[in-house]
């Protein structure tokens, strides 16, 4: 009986290691969107009609499963375990189908997702001027974010802060009044631009990175299916 081809065995191991790394990247980027400051503290308080995080939640699940499958594939290849290879093949096929379906949905609903994001930001803009103690966490988080992004206010600039401006203006302050990106407001030199565009771009950029990785992995996954079938057949002939 013929043995398992060493070249295919090593290729399968390398493939699964790269596959595991890709899963780790997808998982980390998706979690950074879902659990980061923008996702957790800036977007979460607003109750938009559409859930902005459905695609992100799916990708967190996909990333975790890819890591498990990568580990399973490595072990199956090295130990020449037929059962592990079957599990790997079935799991990889399901992930591939899920990725394709999620990618199609995300692409066709791109404009609706952007509308939902914009609506959430508009809703949350009202929270900046609130005097309710329950909104202090959101206001503090946004104050730190606007300092990082070098902007002021969420939609309409500094006026979004209302009477709270005097309490949070320091993170809006601009280094120089002569700078074209700065303006005067209530006697303070602040950034002219609101944070609306910056937050939208940041969210969209991270989501694009994750989706690009997911689509790129689809081609690699097809190779993984072929490798696993060939390796499994050789194991049976051994």
Swiss-Prot record:
Coiled-coil blocks = none
From the record, give the transmembrane residue ranges.
Answer: 10-33, 58-72, 84-109, 207-231
Q: Which UniProt keywords apply?
A: Cell membrane, Glycoprotein, Membrane, Transmembrane, Transmembrane helix
Principal cellular location given in the protein's record? membrane
Q: Topologically, how does it sit relative to the membrane?
A: Multi-pass membrane protein
Source organism, top-level taxon:
Eukaryota
Q: Known Pfam families for this protein? A: Tetraspanin
Positions annotated as glycosylated: 118
- Keyword 4Fe-4S present in the record's keywords: the answer is no
Ranges per topology, Cytoplasmic: 1-9, 73-83, 232-238
Q: Where in the cell is it found?
A: Cell membrane
Taken from the record's topology, the Extracellular segments are 34-57, 110-206
Q: Name one GO cellular component term.
A: plasma membrane
Similarity comment: Belongs to the tetraspanin (TM4SF) family.
Role of this protein: Structural component of specialized membrane microdomains known as tetraspanin-enriched microdomains (TERMs), which act as platforms for receptor clustering and signaling. Participates thereby in diverse biological functions such as cell signal transduction, migration and protein trafficking. Promotes ADAM17-mediated TNF-alpha processing through recruitment of ADAM17 to tetraspanin-enriched micro-domains (TEMs). Forms a complex with RICTOR and integrin alpha3/ITGA3 to mediate mTORC2 activation and AKT1 phosphorylation leading to cell migration.
Record-given protein name: Tetraspanin-8
Q: Which organism is it from?
A: Bos taurus (Bovine)
Q: Which gene encodes it?
A: TSPAN8
């Amino acid at each position: 009986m013929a043995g398992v081809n060493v070249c295919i065995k090593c290729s399968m191991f390398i493939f699964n290691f790269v596959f595991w790394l890709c899963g780790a990247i997808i998982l980390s980027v998706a979690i950074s969107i879902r659990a980061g400051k923008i996702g957790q503290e800036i977007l979460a308080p607003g109750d938009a009609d559409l859930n902005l995080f459905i695609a992100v939640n799916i990708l967190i699940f996909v990333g975790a499963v890819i890591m498990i499958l990568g580990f399973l594939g490595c072990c199956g290849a090295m130990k020449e375990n037929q059962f592990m290879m079957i599990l790997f093949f079935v799991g990889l096929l399901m992930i591939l189908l899920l990725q394709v379906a999620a990618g199609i949905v995300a692409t066709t609903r791109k404009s609706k997702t952007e509308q939902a994001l914009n609506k959430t930001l508009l809703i949350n803009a009202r929270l900046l001027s609130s005097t309710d103690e329950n909104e202090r966490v959101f206001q503090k988080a946004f104050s730190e974010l606007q300092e990082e992004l070098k902007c002021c206010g969420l939609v309409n600039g500094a006026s979004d802060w209302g009477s709270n401006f005097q309490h949070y203006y320091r993170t809006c302050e601009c280094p120089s009044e002569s700078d074209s990106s700065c303006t005067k407001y209530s006697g303070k030199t602040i950034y002219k631009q609101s944070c609306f565009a910056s937050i939208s771009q940041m969210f969209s950029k991270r989501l694009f990175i994750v989706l690009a990785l997911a689509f790129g992995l689809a081609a690699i996954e097809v190779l993984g299916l072929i490798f696993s079938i060939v390796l499994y057949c050789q194991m049976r002939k051994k």
